[in-house]
């Protein structure tokens, strides 16, 4: 069965698992360019949005939680936007990617058996800086915390019930000591998640 576990160190794979792979990127526009450059550096191919080509990997970047004083002071509209950004849109992207990896799978679940594909959701980073209050961290953990069971539950279904090799992984950047998230570490993690050994787990990586 798929185990969910959390790790604080960046898993390394000596092999370049992104070489020759077709990658779809979506999400926060401020990150897309740097991710595309890092994927190209590893000889991966970032597919244009309208491309019909089959992908091996779908990466969705949620972007970070915007600045606000208290969750309880948000308007309904502001709250709905956050729910869309961190729950509804990642879920929709995941659903579309799974449909692309397993065409017709929703009508015939047998098609999932042995199908392959990777979906990586990069969630909101913890705040960076030396004097970050617990209150600031807690606001972000509300959304990071909502994403963890989503990835785990989808993986259990894909692995245990449908017997497929399609996996959804969640990366939660940032450190509790307030250091800036490192994009290279995130790319090393994605490279590892493309490896065969990663498919036996549902890793939630800090």
Residue ranges of predicted features:
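C-terminal helical subdomain
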Residues: 164-166, 170-206
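Catalytic loop of short-chain dehydrogenase/reductase
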Residues: 14, 61-89, 94, 98-162, ...
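Short, contiguous clusters of charged residues that form electrostatic/catalytic patches at enzyme active sites
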Residues: 4, 8, 88, 92, ...
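A structural signal for isolated positions on well-ordered beta-strands in alpha/beta enzyme cores
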Residues: 24, 118-120, 167-169
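Conserved acidic residues
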Residues: 55-56, 117
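Interaction modules related to DNA damage response and DNA replication/repair
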Residues: 44-51
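Non-catalytic terminal and boundary segments that flank Rossmann-like NAD(P)-dependent oxidoreductase
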Residues: 1-44, 56, 67, 80, ...
């Amino acid at each position: 069965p798929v185990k969910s576990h959390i790790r604080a160190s960046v898993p390394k794979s000596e092999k370049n698992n992104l070489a020759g792979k077709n990658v779809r990127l979506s999400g926060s526009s401020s990150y897309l360019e740097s991710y595309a450059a890092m994927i190209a550096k590893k000889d991966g191919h970032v597919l244009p949005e309208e491309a019909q080509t089959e992908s091996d990997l779908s990466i969705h970047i949620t972007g970070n939680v915007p600045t606000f004083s208290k969750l309880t002071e948000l308007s309904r509209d502001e709250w709905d936007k956050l729910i869309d950004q961190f729950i509804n849109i990642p879920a929709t992207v995941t659903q579309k990617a799974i449909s692309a990896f397993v065409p017709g799978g929703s009508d015939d679940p047998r098609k999932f058996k042995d199908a392959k594909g990777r979906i990586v959701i990069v969630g909101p980073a913890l705040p960076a800086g030396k004097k970050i209050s617990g209150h600031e961290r807690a606001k972000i953990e509300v959304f990071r915390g909502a994403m963890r069971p989503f990835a785990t539950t989808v993986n259990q279904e894909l692995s245990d019930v449908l017997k497929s090799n399609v996996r959804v992984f969640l990366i939660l950047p940032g450190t509790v000591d307030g250091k800036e998230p490192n994009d290279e570490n995130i790319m090393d993690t994605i490279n590892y998640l493309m490896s065969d050994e990663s498919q036996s787990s549902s890793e939630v990586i800090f």
